[in-house]
Every structure is written in C-alpha cells, then in structure tokens.
Amino acid sequence: MMQDEHGKSKQTLIMIVDDDAALGEMLSIVLNGSGFETVTCQDGLRAVEMFPTLHPDLVLLDIMLPGLDGVQVAQRIRQTANTPIIMLTAKSDTTDVVKGLEAGADDYVVKPFEVVELMARIKARLRTLGMGASSDGAAAKLPEFLHCGILEMNRVRHTAKKNGIDLHLTPMEFELLYVLAVHEDEPLSRTSLLKQVWGYDDGGDAKLVNVHVQRLRMKVESNPEKPQIVQTVRGIGYKFVAPTE
C-alpha cells in the first residue's frame, strides 16, 4: 500500500507498457494476485499520454515499443516525474541497457524472466520509494538526516540540497547518494552498492551502479568531468567526500 497526498492508504498502481498483450495480461494477473492495481498499455506514445493522469507508483517498461520506444518513454517520464521505472528488455545488449538507464530507468529485467525475479525487483524499488520498509530492517537502521558539508539530505522527505538548492534526485539517485554519504570517505564496491541500494543479494549488473553514478554526478558535481563528491576508487568502486564549496 502507498499513501496519497492526504496520507490515506491507496492500492499501489503499476503501469505495464509492453506491446505483447499476452505478457501484459499475465503480469496483470500475477500483480493483481499480489495486491497491486495494474493498468496496461501497448504503445509508447499512448503511455506518455496516460502517465500524467494515472500517476502510477511504478512503471514496467518494454524497450521495443510502437509509437515511441521505451527509451523515449523513460525520457518523457523523467521530464516531470521520479516514478520508479523497470525496463523489460528482450535484449541483454549493453548498448540498449545503458541507453535505458541513461534515460532514467532504475533497473532492468531481461526477457524471458522468472516472475519471482520480477516481483523481487518491483518490491525492492517500492521499498526504496517508501524508504525504510526493507524486510531485513537494514534501511531502517540508516539515519533519517545527514549534513555533510554543504550537502543536506532528508530521508523522510526524500530530498537532497546542495547550498540550499534542491538537487531533484530520483529515488534511486537519492538512495545511492545517501548510502555513499553514510559511509563517508569509505570506498564501497559495486557489489556492496548493488546489495545496499538495489537489493541484489547475489550478482547484479555493475552497469546499474556505473550509469547511476554518472547521472548522480550530473546533478551533484560542479564539474561532472572532475568529480569531487562521488569519487571513483580504482579497483574498488566509489566513495563519498563531503563537499565544502
């Protein structure tokens, strides 16, 4: 269950955008059976038109679509909303995956996939959105507020400000920055970040971390080409250094 702007509980709405009608119907049945409300769409342009009215809590988005492809749909959504997006792709090709992530997707699943795998990805993304509902309680152990130099982060309101200016981070960008900041000056491996931020217990794709770091740097760094806040640690991963100016 999610909450509306008045704090009242509402059924979580998942928008399924896939030109495979049979797959869309199957996913709807599975998700409805798990307590989610669903709406399906088979065309990218129609999905963009429907999104502002529906205000879904999460979007399952195929890459190969008529009208507009999934990358274009993700770009349109990200212009106005930070709604979690999970890409569904029949291609594991690096280029397609990276394009989807760069467009604003939070995660991806390669077809054919096990339903249990997709459900795990959905629940992990909704936990990130809800902040603190992780089954192992790990998220609840993180502090609600951080003040690191000129950067302020509020995990309750899901906001990050640099010099008092809102950075407008997506839920995944916020969570990535928050986890790095909690471990200030401590190098974290991509495997560790995949577990702490994305909820992958085993495996996971390092591209998820790399592309999200690139996106994050575009918003938090004064010069993304020479990052001072989210720094690369060769052979390990990344570390957070509190900004002072």
Model-derived features: where do they sit?
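Basic, amphipathic DNA-recognition helix from helix-turn-helix-like DNA-binding domains
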Residues: 75, 79, 84-147
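Short hydrophobic/Thr-rich beta-strand motif most characteristic of the beta2 strand and flanking loop
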Residues: 35-42, 50
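Acidic catalytic/metal-coordinating carboxylates
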Residues: 43-46, 69-72
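Charged docking surfaces used in two-component/phosphorelay signaling
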Residues: 25-33
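Non-catalytic signal-transmission and effector/linker regions of two-component phosphorelay proteins
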Residues: 1-15
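Active-site beta3 strand of CheY-like receiver
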Residues: 54-60, 65
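Positively charged, aromatic-enriched patches within helix-turn-helix-type DNA-binding elements
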Residues: 159-236
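Short, Lys/Arg-enriched segments at the junction into DNA-binding effector domains
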Residues: 10-13, 124-187, 191
